[in-house]
């Protein structure tokens, strides 16, 4: 699932009333997930779908006109034949506590075959072979076929109330049936379970005195020369062939950081394997997150993934476990990553449940995990957590960036209707929550996190931030759901002043796009970043050509 899409534009009323009645929620969800009308944005000319070097057809996230040579689609009915109204049915769900220890089974995978079109594990997953004409059923003789019997039209249809499905048979509007669909709503109840994760020792409290953190002089925004889709990173038809190599058919995000010189980690969100189908999230072989590695320096022709962390042959494993229980912990989603010395860190959010309204979700907390074996296994720190009390936590979805003596933490609340806050911590104390200083009105203060001053005006989500050593400037990319765009800002210091947002990607051009995660080897002139598209539920590499201010 990663981050749920925001549709084409965010709904202000949805942001103000997240607890609206179920029917209103369903109506809003339907409205927000409908693509923008054609009148809002011209479609790009039709083009055949992309094909990788093995002849496999991939996905094109661009908003294109339909194939002019294809037969016209059947007309849509004026009204659906049935409207389903979900009815929550509470169900007591025992949840053993503490959490079970993670399964850290890992293998050292064999190198990929030299031939990129050769599947590394054909005994597990192989390219479907075309049907054998000799075994195909022969068409029957039309002369011997009989017409199917058609039931007589009574001129009426059953409904939930008198006349709700009536029709005179003379072309009158047929009203849809109303059906109430039971939907299990788990009510988690903690119960004692077997021994699980051992408690960790608490770090000593550290409170650093307040220090000045004034705004730096504003810089001019870069001029955007061009933005182009470089290529599909994951899924069927991608150059990486992640479906055949690692059972990654559908996934999202693609959060990147440098693990060591010459290597970049790529973290993905909710991932599904063989059996996933086009149309969004869900499917077999659900893993909350997976991790790949890349040494590809030439991004102009795409992002190559060399390998992934695996628990068995050709199977990318889940790194940060989750309980997968709605209203307790549905999933755990990476939000950023960074390295300090030999240790890797990953920020993540523990998702309590996804909302019926796109762009909204509830978290339990935002947390930090670390790895001392270059990302093969991870430990969730039990104290470096920012709890989401009453849904008001400001640092639930974070992007963390080491620079100088500090690690800077940019954060937003759960969902896509919050503002950006900022904190910092010394590198040696990154797992000690009490050592963090929050940027409050020009001061680095040992304050309560909710007092952090918003960095910029407006809503933001899915932050990605990097410090560009060449220009000595900060780059920040995020989804502005109110604007319906992935935007970029720059600043001379993490607290700003930040430039106005420069639009990189519009959801008019890339419907239901989200993300915007910067490749760490970008520059002030060449910005490479990943986006996700909801319906094809996979990751794409984008390239923005910039003209920075001189």
Mark where each language-model region is.
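Blade-edge beta-strand/turn elements of extracellular beta-propeller
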Residues: 220-243, 311-324, 373-391, 433-455, ...
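Blade-level signature of beta-propeller repeat domains, shared across WD40, Kelch, NHL, RCC1
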Residues: 516-550
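Loop/turn-rich, solvent-exposed surfaces of beta-rich toroidal or solenoidal domains
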Residues: 5, 456-493
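Conserved blade-ending motifs and adjacent loop-strand segments that build the rim/top face
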Residues: 5-18, 245-246, 495-522
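N-terminal regions that are enriched for targeting/export leaders
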Residues: 5, 38, 43-335, 339-340, ...
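Beta-propeller blade signature
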Residues: 280-303, 360-376, 421-428, 488-494, ...
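Secretory targeting and sorting signals
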Residues: 1-41
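Hydrophobic core segments of beta-strands in well-ordered, beta-rich domains
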Residues: 257-259, 263-277, 333-359, 397-415, ...
């Amino acid at each position: 699932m990663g981050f749920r899409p925001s549709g084409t534009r965010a709904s202000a009323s949805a942001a103000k009333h997240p607890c609206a009645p179920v029917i209103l929620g369903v109506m809003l969800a339907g409205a927000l997930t409908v693509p923008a009308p054609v009148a809002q944005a011209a479609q790009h000319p039709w083009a055949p779908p992309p094909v990788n070097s093995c002849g496999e057809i991939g996905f094109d996230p661009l908003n294109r006109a339909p194939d002019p040579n294809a037969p016209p689609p059947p007309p849509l009915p004026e009204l659906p034949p049935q409207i389903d109204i979900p009815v929550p049915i509470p169900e007591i769900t025992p949840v053993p506590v503490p959490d079970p220890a993670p399964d850290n089974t890992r293998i050292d995978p064999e190198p990929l075959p030299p031939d990129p079109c050769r599947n590394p594990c054909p005994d597990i997953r192989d390219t479907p072979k075309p049907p054998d004409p000799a075994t195909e059923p022969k068409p029957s003789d039309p002369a011997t076929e009989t017409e199917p019997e058609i039931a007589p039209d009574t001129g009426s249809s059953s409904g939930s109330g008198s006349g709700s499905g009536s029709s005179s048979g003379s072309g009158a509007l047929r009203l849809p049936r109303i059906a109430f669909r039971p939907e299990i709503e788990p009510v988690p109840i903690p119960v004692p379970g077997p021994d699980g994760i051992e408690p960790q020792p608490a770090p000593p409290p550290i409170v650093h005195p307040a220090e000045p953190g004034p705004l730096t002089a504003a810089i001019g925004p870069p001029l955007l020369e061009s933005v182009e889709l470089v290529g599909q990173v994951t899924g069927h038809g991608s150059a990486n062939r992640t479906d055949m190599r690692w059972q990654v058919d559908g996934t999202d995000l693609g959060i990147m950081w440098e693990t060591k010189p010459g290597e970049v980690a790529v973290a993905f969100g909710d991932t599904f394997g063989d059996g996933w189908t086009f149309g969004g999230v869900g499917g077999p072989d659900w893993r909350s997150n997976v991790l790949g590695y890349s040494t590809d320096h030439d991004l102009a022709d795409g992002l190559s993934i060399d390998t992934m962390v695996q628990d068995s042959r050709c199977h990318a494993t889940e790194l940060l476990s989750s309980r997968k229980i709605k209203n307790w912990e549905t999933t755990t989603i990476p939000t950023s990553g960074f390295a300090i010395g030999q240790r890797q860190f990953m920020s993540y959010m523990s998702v309590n449940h996804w909302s019926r309204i796109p762009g909204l979700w509830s978290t339990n907390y935002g947390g930090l995990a670390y790895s001392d074996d270059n990302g093969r296994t991870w430990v969730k720190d039990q104290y470096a957590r920012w709890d989401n009390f009453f849904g008001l936590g400001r640092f639930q979805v974070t992007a963390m960036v080491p620079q100088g003596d500090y690690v800077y933490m940019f954060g937003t609340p759960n969902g896509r209707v919050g503002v950006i806050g900022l904190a910092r911590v010394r590198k040696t104390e990154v797992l000690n929550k009490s050592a963090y200083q929050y940027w409050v009105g020009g001061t680095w203060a040992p304050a309560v996190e909710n007092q952090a001053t918003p960095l910029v005006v407006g809503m933001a989500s899915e932050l990605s931030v990097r410090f560009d050593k060449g220009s000595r400037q900060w780059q920040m990319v995020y989804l502005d759901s109110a604007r319906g765009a992935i935007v970029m800002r720059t600043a001379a210091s993490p607290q700003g002043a930040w430039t106005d947002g420069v639009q990189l990607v519009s959801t008019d051009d890339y419907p239901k796009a989200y993300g915007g995660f910067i490749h760490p080897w970008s520059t002030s002139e060449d910005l490479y970043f990943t986006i996700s598209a909801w319906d094809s539920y996979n990751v794409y590499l984008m390239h923005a050509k910039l003209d920075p201010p001189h």
